[in-house]
Amino acid sequence: MDSTNLYSIDSVSALLFPVFKRYNVRKAILFGSIAKGTANASSDLDVLVDSNLRGMRFVGLLEDLQEAVHMDVDLLDVTRIQKGSPVAAEIQKTGVVIYEE
């Protein structure tokens, strides 16, 4: 990504769209510092996905997302989020849908 759009939700969404489509992700939500507009050079990309991916297919999605944006991605599956947890609260507060079938 060029540095002027490094942390733009629109630019991140555009880069990740083909990856989500290729892996048949049902929905993806961006949350955390990039979604809040407070990201810096050391920020990672926080993404929650709703998918049927498990095991190596999930790892493949993670690797392809990181390659697409050239930054670390913290990838979570919706089935792993506990209701009422701090992560669930962060997603509820800052989450932005960036992909949906």
Language-model segments: which ranges?
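Catalytic core of pol beta-like nucleotidyltransferases
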Residues: 1-27, 36-41, 52-101
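Acidic Asp/Glu-based divalent-cation binding sites
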Residues: 44-46
